[in-house]
Amino acid sequence: MRVMGLDVGSKTVGVAISDPLGFTAQGVEIIKINEEAKEFGFDRLGELVKEYQVDKFVVGLPKNMNNTEGPRVEASKAYGDKIKEIFNLPVDYQDERLTTVQAERMLVEQADVSRDKRKKVIDKLAAQLILQNYLDRMF
């Protein structure tokens, strides 16, 4: 079962995919979107769904530290509802608190990546962490 993890932002969607057995997550790419212009990257997402033969989506939920839900959680859930409708695949949600912070720390401390380069990969790595956390919880 291949699971696709998504880190949904207002300008980008980080994409990760599980291995066929559902044990490990790998970052795939970052899809540029524009919420204000109603451009959500569904065409590119569809190409990736076909390429990787995806069976399920996991969308990160950026809850507040006190476990409350803000406007970004609503946007992520709306994105999840839309991909469920478009691709007719199940969608689960994973708490993503601190995954971007964790991703940034990994890039700085372990890989010594410059700020400009971090901006280009941070969402993909965050999607990978969201998906890996989900896989670890499920299996």
From Swiss-Prot:
Record keywords, A-Z: Cytoplasm, Hydrolase, Nuclease, Ribosome biogenesis
* SUPFAM superfamilies from the UniProt entry: Ribonuclease H-like
Q: Where in the cell is it found?
A: Cytoplasm
Asked if the record carries the keyword Repeat, the reply is: no
At the top of the EC hierarchy, this enzyme's class is hydrolase
Q: Which Gene3D superfamilies match?
A: YqgF/RNase H-like domain (3.30.420.140)
Instruction: Give the GO molecular function terms.
Output: nuclease activity
> What EC numbers are recorded for this enzyme?
3.1.-.-
Which purpose does this protein serve, as stated in its record? Answer: Could be a nuclease involved in processing of the 5'-end of pre-16S rRNA.
NCBIfam families (UniProt xref): RNAse_H_YqgF (TIGR00250)
What's the protein name? Putative pre-16S rRNA nuclease
> Which organism's genome codes for this protein?
Streptococcus thermophilus (strain ATCC BAA-491 / LMD-9)
